Every structure is written in C-alpha cells, then in structure tokens.
C-alpha cells in the first residue's frame, strides 16, 4: 500500500509541476528542488484531495514541503478515515 500511495503522490506532483518522476525521492523538497511556486503547491494540495478523497487544504502546506512529508500527511489522513 505504501508504494501505491507513493506512486499516486508522484503522479499528482508530476501533473502539477513539469518534472520527471524519477527526480522525486523521499527528501525531494518541492520548492528548493522542484522549484514549485505557491500556485503549484496549491494545485498539489487540491490534486491530493481529489486523488485520495481526503480533506486537504492550503493550511496543510507547512507540513508538506518534501515528498516524504506529503506521503506522511496522506497516510495519516487515510488512516483517520478508517
């Protein structure tokens, strides 16, 4: 399941930012490494909400700066639904 979540998170990121999926790893920073701007970050948050059917908004951004952070937030949101 973790690999599925990671692959889906990568899909969301690459649909919002023009980057190669292979350039994303656990410590990839959205702003510093992928040069995401504020609109990209909001697109990612809303993309995650749609992809995983979770409640996620721009207030979650401070906790979602790296790929690993995003996966952790998504997993936590999915677990809280159960």
Curated annotation (Swiss-Prot):
Protein name: Probable acyl carrier protein IacP
Posttranslational modification: 4'-phosphopantetheine is transferred from CoA to a specific serine of apo-IacP.
PROSITE patterns reported in the protein's UniProt record: CARRIER (PS50075)
Compartment(s) where it occurs, according to its Swiss-Prot or TrEMBL record: Cytoplasm
GO MF, one annotated term: acyl carrier activity
Lineage: Bacteria, Pseudomonadati, Pseudomonadota, Gammaproteobacteria, Enterobacterales
Major site of localization recorded for this protein: cytoplasm
Disulfide bonds: none
One Gene Ontology cellular component: membrane
GO terms, biological process: lipid A biosynthetic process
Pfam families to which the protein is assigned, alphabetical: PP-binding
O-(pantetheine 4'-phosphoryl)serine found at: 38
